[in-house]
Amino acid sequence: MSETANSRTTERKQDHIEICLHGDVVFNGKTTGFERFAFEHAALPEISFSDIDLSTSFLGKSIGAPLMISSMTGGYSEAATLNQRLAEAAERFGIPLGVGSMRQALENRSYRESFAVVRKYAPTVQIFANIGAPEVAKGLTESEINTMLELLRADGLIVHLNAAQELFQPEGNTDFRHVLEQLALLSAKIPVPVLVKEVGCGISASAARQLIAAGVKAIDVAGAGGISWQKVEEIRYTRQFGQERRFSLQALDELLNWGIPTAQCLIDIGALKKESPGLNGIEIVASGGVGSGMDVAKSLALGAQLAASARALLKALHDGVLEETITSWLNDLRAVMFLTGTATIAELRHKTLITKP
């Protein structure tokens, strides 16, 4: 990659962080759907609060709590500091961490340290590498795969599906042909599990079925209700070119708020798994607008193995309260478990949610 192209990629990654922290990038008129549900109160919990156990497992490995610090950043100098602090928090709580897209690490060695720092400060927890669907569609070489995995000593590879983001991105790649074909090839030859995640538009049951058939081991629904990457890229576009001229004003609002709410994704994929018992080995991650331990708890009751968050934790990191925020979320989760009489995460997953009137 040329020096100019590297500079543009670095600028884009910096823009993403700045806009996510300070821009108006949440969905309008569309929520995660978690607010539609409530837990039934257990007047007789029959457990001690001190006995509540948040530990669980993900992809065969024990984790301290059903929470993942979701893919955010990497590939520019300032990202090393952000990733170090995220890694330190992940290690403290014993929870998984996903890095941002590693495309730039493949194209320029000078940016690899911003990713490698993660394993240095999180030596014992699950770390997930990350690459975009357009890169997968072109066919990753064995060298590229090895570079990503070895750089992090990764426990898995996340492939992110971001068609809507690429559509709005000024320099976006909208060629999504052969993604499934290449995913199947990748899943068959890679020595660690492949996870597939959206980035805020959600994964439907039909898409989940296709992904499972391609051999992925986990699906992160990353539904609508939190950050809209269309809005992030729209801000970048208008900064560069002024008024939006690509889409009609009549359609723009719906396109910017395009996506399936997170809770609906979980419900639909949960129904798919019930219809097809052979799919029960696939683990589901709930992300997209997760902003508290209550959201984590509802995610688990809706069928997720764990929940994940990016923007809320990034903002907490920016404000200097990352570990305090994670602690409060885990306390939220313990509170829900106590008030529903569930001592373990496995028990919480079997709780039935009440639909609010």
Swiss-Prot record:
Function in brief: Involved in the biosynthesis of isoprenoids. Catalyzes the 1,3-allylic rearrangement of the homoallylic substrate isopentenyl (IPP) to its allylic isomer, dimethylallyl diphosphate (DMAPP).
Assembly with partners or alone: Homooctamer. Dimer of tetramers.
Stated name of the protein: Isopentenyl-diphosphate delta-isomerase
Residues annotated to bind Mg(2+): E166
Residues that hold FMN according to the record: S70, S71, M72, T73, S101, N130, K197, A310, R311
Keywords: Cytoplasm, Flavoprotein, FMN, Isomerase, Isoprene biosynthesis, Magnesium, Metal-binding, NADP
Source organism: Pelodictyon phaeoclathratiforme (strain DSM 5477 / BU-1)
UniProt family annotation: Belongs to the IPP isomerase type 2 family.
InterPro entries reported in the protein's UniProt record: Aldolase_TIM, FMN-dep_DH, IPdP_isomerase
Name of the encoding gene: fni
EC number: 5.3.3.2
